[in-house]
A protein has these predicted regions:
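Short, hydrophobic beta-strand segments that form beta-sheet elements in well-ordered domains
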Residues: 12-17, 113-116, 127-128, 141-143
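ATP-grasp fold ATP-binding core
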Residues: 104, 112-114, 121-139, 157-167, ...
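Short, charged, surface-exposed secondary-structure boundary motifs
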Residues: 25, 42-44, 86, 92-96, ...
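ATP-binding N-terminal substructure of ATP-dependent carboxylate-amine bond-forming enzymes
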Residues: 1-84
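Helix N-cap/beta->alpha junction signal
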Residues: 62, 96-97, 145
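Short loop/helix-cap segments at secondary-structure boundaries that form the rim of catalytic
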Residues: 22-28, 119-124, 151-155
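Phosphate-binding site of ATP-dependent enzymes
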Residues: 141-210
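Glycine-/Pro-rich loop/turn segments that contact NAD(P) or position catalytic residues
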Residues: 81, 88-114
């Protein structure tokens, strides 16, 4: 919003939510209700909103919505709405942590080895188990021994197991244009985290990460 003011652009923000209670809606000029992303009418409801409100750009804010939106970008294009989103193959790399690990290896980056069956995990402990497509640290557990691992594995349908790695953690925000070219890159240290969400962060313009 501040950028639009600086550029003298007339900007109106619309927000959509299932319950109409999402905290971010307070920053929107107008709000709309939509069904669950799992509902077969989800995409059509969003398209109807985009048509009625003449939405220029749709910006997803929840990672669970990314794949379905990416697969339907052409439908939004037809009504004049651009979805600010990556291609489906890139989203699949990020959403499935098995694919993420394989991608890191293909780039020559170090990453903890991933296991999909607790019976095959050789150690060491502690280790970490979490859903392969999870978010917000839901059903993510630090495990101290094999007995604990078996218990947690029984509670998660599709999981990954990795050796526990401690250290400083960074997120790198990359703002790109519609062709995927980086406009600005901002590394930041996750100083304090709760339920997978950052409470306190510190920008660190490190040239190696950039």
């Amino acid at each position: 919003r501040q950028a639009a003011l600086n550029l003298n652009i007339n900007l109106k923000l619309y927000g959509a939510d299932m319950a109409g209670t999402a905290p971010a809606l307070v920053y929107c000029d107008y709000t709309r209700k939509v069904c669950s992303m799992h509902d077969k009418e989800y995409i059509q409801q969003l398209i109807d909103i985009c048509v009625a409100d003449k939405i220029d750009v749709l910006i997803p804010t929840i990672d669970t919505d990314l794949l379905i939106l990416s697969k339907n970008t052409e439908k939004f294009d037809k009504v004049g709405t651009k979805v600010l989103i990556s291609k489906s193959d890139k989203i699949l790399i990020c959403r499935d942590k098995n694919n993420t690990g394989e991608f890191f290896e293909s780039c020559g980056l170090k990453a903890p080895r991933t296991y999909n069956n607790y019976k095959n995990y050789p150690g060491p402990y502690p280790c970490f188990i979490k859903p392969k497509d999870g978010s917000s640290s839901t059903n993510a557990f630090k495990v101290e021994n094999g007995e604990e691992l078996a218990v947690y594995a029984g509670q998660i349908s599709e999981y990954i197991i990795q050796p526990f790695v401690s250290g400083r953690e960074f997120t790198i925000d990359i703002f790109c244009d519609f062709e995927g070219n980086p406009i600005f890159i901002t590394p930041r240290e996750r100083v304090q985290v709760r339920a997978g969400e950052v409470l306190k962060t510190m920008i660190c313009m490190d040239k190696v990460m950039i």
